[in-house]
Amino acid sequence: MEPSGSEQLYEDPDPGGKSQDAEARRQTESEQKLSKMTHNALENINVIGQGLKHLFQHQRRRSSVSPHDVQQIQTDPEPEVDLDSQNACAEIDGVSTHPTALNRVLQQIRVPPKMKRGTSLHSRRGKSEAPKGSPQINRKSGQEVAAVIQSGRPRSSSTTDAPTSSSVMEIACAAGVCVPGEEATAERIERLEVSSLAQTSSAVASSTDGSIHTESVDGIPDPQRTKAAIAHLQQKILKLTEQIKIAQTARDDNVAEYLKLANSADKQQAARIKQVFEKKNQKSAQTILQLQKKLEHYHRKLREVEQNGIPRQPKDVFRDMHQGLKDVGAKVTGFSEGVVDSVKGGFSSFSQATHSAAGAVVSKPREIASLIRNKFGSADNIPNLKDSLEEGQVDDGGKALGVISNFQSSPKYGSEEDCSSATSGSVGANSTTGGIAVGASSSKTNTLDMQSSGFDALLHEVQEIRETQARLEDSFETLKEHYQRDYSLIMQTLQEERYRCERLEEQLNDLTELHQNEILNLKQELASMEEKIAYQSYERARDIQEALEACQTRISKMELQQQQQQVVQLEGLENATARNLLGKLINILLAVMAVLLVFVSTVANCVVPLMKTRNRTFSTLFLVAFIAFLWKHWDALFSYVDRLFSPPR
């Protein structure tokens, strides 16, 4: 993953960036802790390198002397002791994972002979040239092997190679350094050949699997950075969701307000309100669309971060590696001086084969078969190694080349001696371990036995690496299935959310269309009512106009009649007196008739109540008869009453 892709997550500006600052602060603290741990590991490696430097300088001097001198050095130790060597050995004793074997080595090597500091590799070559028949490893090929093996190792291997260094010291302790004589030398050569084969096979295997290591360095996610990035993205997704909800609520409010205003507005105001509403609606729709696109972008980023994670920044990794290689190279200069000078005999041929195999990991893996066939004379088990190396070359050759170019161009040294000190720890350990005992000559039989045993160890290492690779593939497949399940679940959830959002959008569109249709219907009804009212008012005005015209016609007729009557009256002025008398007579007759009618009505009003029932009728008739009787005999009755009421005489 490119650094721009890992840093892009933190380049987005956040308005409320307090949480982001806190995360950045925690990230810097974690990086400082990692740098401290790396520095401590580098110091431990430097201590181990210093101890190995003095150790292998002493063993190199011992391998250059005769067995008689070895016995004399062991029997007659010098009283002077190098304090630096003792301190380094004491520190190695505290750091190494095998203190008992190292204590045996330190007890055997108590009085190292003094060496002149400052003697370069070229001067030593001049002093001790190899025999004519023994091939030596070219310095360039040794550097290429170191670069290839270094490319197969993780970038953090310079800070975590304490077990490798301890294994090298264990090999040195198991080699029987203090055994004098020819037999001890042959035994040391055999053991060192076996251990060198194992170490070289592990180096070749690591270079074969260089793609896995480089990918693990480039692809190992930093948990703290990944966690912070996921939290940051989730916070942004929540903010965008809230903004989308707010925008949708504002759009609904605008629709409700438009409907409310459209109901209580006339035509001109309704058109103006409609224009304003359409502008606001388009703007809110664009805003919601942009927020949804941004939300999908952050969801995609979150999926990528959850799947791939955020690795360490390559700048920091290469800076730490460069510093670590500088320190280790400066401390293990003497350790690397003995690599090229002391590799002789049968081990030199195997080192050349190892170099060819390591170079073939990147370019030509089939050369391994021909080289090992020429060197060892047997090609029974070569296809297994060739297949494993071909797989590493086909899958990850380009990545191994990239790492080789990085590590070859990273350390910058002023001389060839400094450059040789920055090679890989495993190759240097193997070559130096081989250089401890190659000083003495060995027979062809021992060489063939050692080569066959070394080849068996190499095949055993290749088999173990294959098993490890199979386990890694199983773990990778399990992890891949887990991430595929998570990815499918997230995609299903995303599809459901997208489907739900689409349904909501469709419902909202339907509701908006319904409101618009209702508004259009209301407008049509208002227009029809307006037309109806206008028609009714026109009809009423026409009726009123017709009535007024009829009244005017009648008035004009009455005026004409009055005029005609006036004309007639003017013509009948001669008979006016007769007409006046006739009128007065008629008036008198009418008055008499009115009096009679009043009398009759009065009598009727008086008689009618007396005639309503049968009893009243009989009573009324009796009363009338009585009155008539009194009226008829009134004189007699009056005299009788007068006599009755007169006083006596």
From Swiss-Prot:
Compositionally biased tracts (Low complexity): 156-166
Biased composition range(s): Basic residues: 113-125
Biased composition (Basic and acidic residues): 20-34
Biased composition (Polar residues): 64-75, 197-214, 420-433
Primary subcellular site in the record, as a coarse category: endoplasmic reticulum
Record InterPro entries: TEX28/TMCC
Positions of post-translational Phosphoserine modification: 378, 410
Compartments in which it is found: Endoplasmic reticulum membrane
Region (Disordered): 1-37, 58-83, 110-166, 197-222, 411-433
TM regions (residue ranges): 588-608, 621-641
Keyword Aminoacyl-tRNA synthetase recorded: no
Modified sites of kind N-acetylmethionine: 1
Quaternary structure note: May form homodimers and heterodimers with TMCC2 or TMCC3 via the coiled-coil domains. Interacts with ribosomal proteins RPL4 and RPS6.
PANTHER family, per the entry: CEREBRAL PROTEIN-11-RELATED (PTHR17613), TRANSMEMBRANE AND COILED-COIL DOMAINS PROTEIN 1 (PTHR17613:SF11)
Protein task: Endoplasmic reticulum membrane protein that promotes endoplasmic reticulum-associated endosome fission. Localizes to contact sites between the endoplasmic reticulum and endosomes and acts by promoting recruitment of the endoplasmic reticulum to endosome tubules for fission. Endosome membrane fission of early and late endosomes is essential to separate regions destined for lysosomal degradation from carriers to be recycled to the plasma membrane.
Protein name: Transmembrane and coiled-coil domains protein 1
Species of provenance: Mus musculus
